[in-house]
Amino acid sequence: MLIIETLPLLRQQIRRWRQEGKRIALVPTMGNLHEGHMTLVDEAKTRADVVVVTIFVNPLQFERPDDLAHYPRTLQEDCEKLTRHGADLVFAPAAADIYPAGLEKQTYVDVPALSTILEGASRPGHFRGVSTIVSKLFNLIQPDVACFGEKDYQQLALIRKMVADMGYDINIVGVPTVRAKDGLALSSRNGYLTEEERQIAPQLSKIMWALAEKMALGERQIDALLEEAAAQLLRVGFTPDELFIRDAETLQPLTVDSQQAVILMAAWLGKARLIDNQLVDLRH
């Protein structure tokens, strides 16, 4: 497995693969890799000849400097895991290589229809940072396919829209959320949980699934459902952050024409902000 840190060497390798007619898959990450990331790599391997994994803690998508400073950086362990899963290249650049003019003078790519609603409303600039770095990686690596986790539902929707609007010829693959045996969605931020909090954490998905079941049975009192879920989260020890039920395709409020809903949940447990989502078929 190749480990490349500079843009010229990356371009050279991508050019070589392109000349050889290789199909390239991209898995963008911020490192601190877990089994969920490995599932993305495994999926990418089935769809391409070579798999490029990027490891870059993107400063543009952090609104709090302390969050950026404390984000775990585990490059050596990450590379060992990726070697075992058969990745072909790890691109791990420095921020100065990605943003040579500095963050203040950086050109941005924004998807305003999706970047300022829901989670974007409470995290200003976050999704603009995501779309900017992903478009930059698309330009550098020129993948045929890119794999993203469905756990970050709004992020995946944003990237799909950016690809459609910007005319990228890239197949965007959403990979189902990987969960621990007790139902907790795998996340790099689970490492912030204490032992006691880790026992409580699966309640987030359980409360979400109970809500989804009520909707599947025909319940449509959205405000009441969300209030009940928030109260349940508080009771078990969470601080609810964001709870939404939206049209799965548009991320706008449900209408009579909505065929599928998505439940989007974010809640704090100690120092960890946990997120999860669940699709609900409304066509019954």
From Swiss-Prot:
ATP binds at residues 30-37, 149-152, 178, 186-189. CDD domains: PanC (cd00560). The reaction proceeds by a bi uni uni bi ping pong mechanism. Beta-alanine binds at Q61. Its main location: cytoplasm. SUPFAM superfamilies: Nucleotidylyl transferase. Keywords: ATP-binding, Cytoplasm, Ligase, Nucleotide-binding, Pantothenate biosynthesis. Catalyzes the condensation of pantoate with beta-alanine in an ATP-dependent reaction via a pantoyl-adenylate intermediate. GO terms for molecular function: ATP binding; pantoate-beta-alanine ligase activity. Pfam families: Pantoate_ligase. This is Pantothenate synthetase. The keyword Ligase applies. GO terms for biological process: pantothenate biosynthetic process. The active site is at H37. The gene is panC. Homodimer. It is found in: Cytoplasm.
